[in-house]
């Protein structure tokens, strides 16, 4: 009977270390672009990010949006075998699971995905960017490509460590 060695345990990569730097509590200045050409609606939020082991983050996002409590959850990680970041998002105002994949481009993580839009009643292509300013500051933006092919900015979140 031969003994088979166990495969080596996966080790965190540089990308996992970048995600680990997001752990903690963040104050968020939100700008929501409800209608193209109109001033954004502004709100403040708080996001708490925790590590799940060495590979994943889970976040809890909370704010008051249009006079109602808004809560969202995100999970984010990096898949070394596919050389890509992966992320999901759910929130209390939508029955849709958002799923994004993407890569790091300089100091920005750029991810894309498709999700059903309750507003347009169609599947829209979404693009999110997260620009790393410092260990204590980052800027997140979300865009959607509308059915006519025009990309619009949906939101900007400016994160500062609390």
For each predicted feature, which ranges?
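Hydrophobic small-molecule pocket/channel-lining residues, especially in calycin-type beta-barrels
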Residues: 1-162
């Amino acid at each position: 009977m031969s003994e088979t060695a166990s495969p080596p345990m996966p080790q965190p990569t540089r990308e996992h270390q970048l995600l680990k730097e997001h752990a903690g509590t963040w104050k968020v200045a939100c700008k929501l672009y409800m209608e193209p050409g109109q001033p954004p609606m502004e709100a403040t939020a708080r996001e708490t990010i925790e590590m799940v082991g060495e590979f994943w983050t889970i976040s809890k996002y909370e704010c008051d949006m249009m006079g109602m409590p808004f809560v969202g959850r995100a999970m984010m990680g990096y898949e070394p075998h596919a050389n890509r970041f992966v992320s999901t998002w759910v929130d209390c105002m939508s029955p849709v699971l958002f799923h994004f994949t993407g890569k790091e481009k300089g100091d920005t993580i750029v991810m894309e995905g498709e999700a059903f839009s309750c507003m347009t009643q169609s599947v829209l292509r979404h693009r999110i960017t997260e620009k790393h300013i410092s260990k204590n500051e980052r800027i997140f933006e979300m865009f959607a490509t509308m059915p006519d092919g025009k990309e619009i900015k949906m939101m900007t979140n400016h994160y500062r460590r609390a």
